[in-house]
Amino acid sequence: MKIRRRIATEQSQGVVRSFLRVAQFTCFILHFTFSSAQPTVDTIIDPKLATVLLYPQIGSTVDNAARTLNVPVLNIDDQVNTPLVLEFDDLTAVYRNFRVKVIHCNADWKRSVLNDVEFTYEYNDNPITDYQLSISTKIPYYHYRYTVPRMKLPGNYVLVVYNEQNREQILFTRRFRLYAQRIGIAAGVRFSTDISRQYNDQQIELSLDYRAYQAQVTSPQDDFKVVIRQNFRDDRAVTDLHPTNVRAFDQVLEYRALDLRNTFPGGNEYRYFDTRTLFSRANYVEKISRLANRNVAYVQAGRPRSTQAYTQFDDFNGLFVIDHLESHNGAIEADYAETIFTLLIDELPGVSVYANGAFNFWALNDRNRLTYDAALGGYRGTIWLKQGVYNYNYAVTGVVPPISRSGVGPTIGNEALVEGDFSQTENDYEIFVYQRPPAARADQLIGYQRINYGKRK
């Protein structure tokens, strides 16, 4: 009932804005092109392609299920020993010829004006030739693997995978970043200094030391573009930060909390479930139905947590890993299961509910939408997911998020309504610093720092 009362006060102002955001997002996907005027996003356009993974191959992690917890952010000098690896599945179970191209982007993820030869060492249009057919799975698929070639410049990049038979048919895109550590970054996380949000938000304060890079700096307060991202999510990023103090003698820029744009909603620890085996129930799986042509996994029914006290537990901060408990060869032996999500909550008029996570690139669409079931007394939906351990949460559209002075851009979904926001939540933050050197034609990523708040021992 508390949630229904909150909706009554917020819905009138939020429904129009939320509708416009969803409509704009939908139109963007339908008219997906790579012009210099449009941003590039993580997205899967072909519904038969699934489980798109991109990660740095650290050491001998090829058989380590946790390898996908390494996000695609890499020091440019480590590309030889730690290449980026792309993996994905084709559920048509028919071999198809795929090709991949790399696009260079500026700090705002709009395509740069650079020609291929300016940022690549090799020919920038390659076939994906490493593939395997799944073994003993009820849902057959081809598993593809591709090692990303080295790039010349630090910055933002997008992998574009397309149909070899039709170069205009883009199938999916995946972002990655290469950085060169040319400046020093010192950062920390604390509760928000906004009294009204001190129990809900987290505040990141940082400073940049550019003494070793000063020859490339002409206007310190304007040259650097700072981006802060929460939990590896580009939909949870602050992009328009300006220094609050310029210490010219020390060549240091400080970013403090004068306008509170450097704050983030704390969120909650992510829910999770384990389907590494389909022969018995594992953590947060209520039931496994082993049918002749498929497996069905029922995730434990959830309830709203926004009105409850914060509870501490470990998670992957929204990520997931693919694994097959019996063989530990999840790439080709993990099966796809019809995964049922259930949220027990009163019907929310004019509101759409979604099961959300990195498995869906944090997009809210028909694939992860839940529908209300009066007999069940809650919302239920089905998503086909490969065996593994998944983090997720529940998000809604139709209600604007709580008012916050955070600089996080307008988001499509409201996660606070069901999950709540707590300043105690353990979160990862990444700081990206971009700059365009004199005479350069594109932005470069010249600094990167990852910090954690509330890590459990």
What are these regions (language model features)?
Residues 1-40:
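Bacterial Sec-dependent N-terminal signal peptides
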Residues 42-49, 177-201, 420-447:
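Low-complexity, Pro/Ser/Thr- and charge-rich linker/hinge segments at domain boundaries
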Residues 51-102, 197-210, 329-341:
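Contiguous beta-strand segments within globular domains
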Residues 113, 118-142, 234-242, 338-387, ...:
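Aromatic-rich carbohydrate-binding modules that target alpha-glucans
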Residues 140-164:
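Ligand-binding face of N-terminal immunoglobulin V-set domains in extracellular IgSF glycoproteins
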Residues 152, 163-170, 278-282, 398-418:
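Short acidic/polar inter-strand loop motif in beta-rich domains
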Residues 217-309:
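Long, internal scaffold/assembly segments composed of regular secondary structure
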Residues 298-349, 451-457:
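Basic K/R-rich, polyanion-interacting modules in nucleoproteins and related proteins
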